[in-house]
């Protein structure tokens, strides 16, 4: 997975996440929307200016915090959830 920051302000981040598809991006977006400091989270697989299919571009808007910190918190939440699922499957 390769990340490329397209645009970043104090409360907004646009970042390309190379090598991912709708499956991962939907999970990431969903987790971000459950995060307290997130005002908005969305992604686009086909940005208007691209002229066609591109790598997904994630947009995160925070209420007040650094959007990179919010993204890191979302990634940590995914790690925790998949770990809990793995443990439950092993225990089954």
From Swiss-Prot:
Coiled coil: none annotated. It is found in: Cytoplasm. It comes from the Archaea. InterPro entries: RBP11-like, RBP11-like_dimer, RNA_pol_Rpb11_13-16kDa_CS, Rpo11-like. The keyword Iron does not apply. NCBIfam families: PRK01146.1-5. Part of the RNA polymerase complex. This is DNA-directed RNA polymerase subunit Rpo11. It comes from Halorubrum lacusprofundi (strain ATCC 49239 / DSM 5036 / JCM 8891 / ACAM 34). The lineage of its organism: Archaea, Methanobacteriati, Methanobacteriota, Stenosarchaea group, Halobacteria.
